[in-house]
Curated annotation (Swiss-Prot):
HAMAP family given in the database record: HisE
Record keyword Metal-binding present: no
Top-level taxon of origin: Bacteria
Chain's gene name: hisE
Entry protein name: Phosphoribosyl-ATP pyrophosphatase
EC primary class: hydrolase
Example of a GO cellular component annotation carried by this entry: cytoplasm
GO molecular function, one term: phosphoribosyl-ATP diphosphatase activity
Main location: cytoplasm
Amino acid sequence: MTANTSTSDTLAHLARVIESRLPQNGGDPDTSYVARLLHKGPNAFLKKIGEEATEVVMAAKDADNGGDKTKVVYEVADLWFHCMIALAHYGLSPADVVVELDRRAGTSGIEEKAMRKVTAREDEQPGAAQ
């Protein structure tokens, strides 16, 4: 594994390339796969995210049964890539995801999930701020 800075730089660079393919930035759906997905709208890239997530699961199951573990990396890369397209569409970046992961650092997954349930219940209360 390379240094975190290198990982951050790679994600930031890829995010900039994806952002350059947004329709409002002149992305050309005739010459760019990313621009084509963005031009088609959320249903197109969200469908790809679902497909790629399924492929991650299948690669992991194969790896559990003696298959090539590097295929998990390949499929996760596809999933991350398509998730980054979604982030760009919604005006977000990988840095926003890292901030959220940092916020969760040191918090038990069980505790974090319990807090989400409490927050959801509070939001459902009559008179809750909308």
